[in-house]
From Swiss-Prot:
One of its GO terms (cellular component) is cytosol. PANTHER family: FE(2+)-TRAFFICKING PROTEIN-RELATED. This is Probable Fe(2+)-trafficking protein. GO terms for molecular function: iron ion binding. SUPFAM superfamilies: YggX-like (SSF111148). GO terms for biological process: cellular response to oxidative stress. It comes from Xanthomonas campestris pv. campestris (strain ATCC 33913 / DSM 3586 / NCPPB 528 / LMG 568 / P 25). Pfam families: Iron_traffic. Keywords: Iron. The keyword Iron applies. HAMAP family: Fe_traffic_YggX (MF_00686). Could be a mediator in iron transactions between iron acquisition and iron-requiring processes, such as synthesis and/or repair of Fe-S clusters in biosynthetic enzymes. Belongs to the Fe(2+)-trafficking protein family.
Amino acid sequence: MSRTVFCQYQQCDTEGLDFAPYPGELGQRIFAQIGKAGWQAWLAHQTMLINENRLSPRDPKHRAFLEAELQKFLFERNADKPEGYVDPLGEE
């Protein structure tokens, strides 16, 4: 049986994650307050950030940037796209 959470990203009740996808307190907050669809939206946004900004997940500064963006994207809903970004699907 799946868990239901009130997703802070989607602002509705939805299917919760199966496990904390991130370490520490932030991971527990994501597990408790973000649904599967919200997490998938973050993964797509994170991929765009990594590609457009040429980030390396191995670089501590880049990881800190991504963590800050994760919090803005999921909980504050005010994450920006990189300057000059053009959606390849034209959905913007």
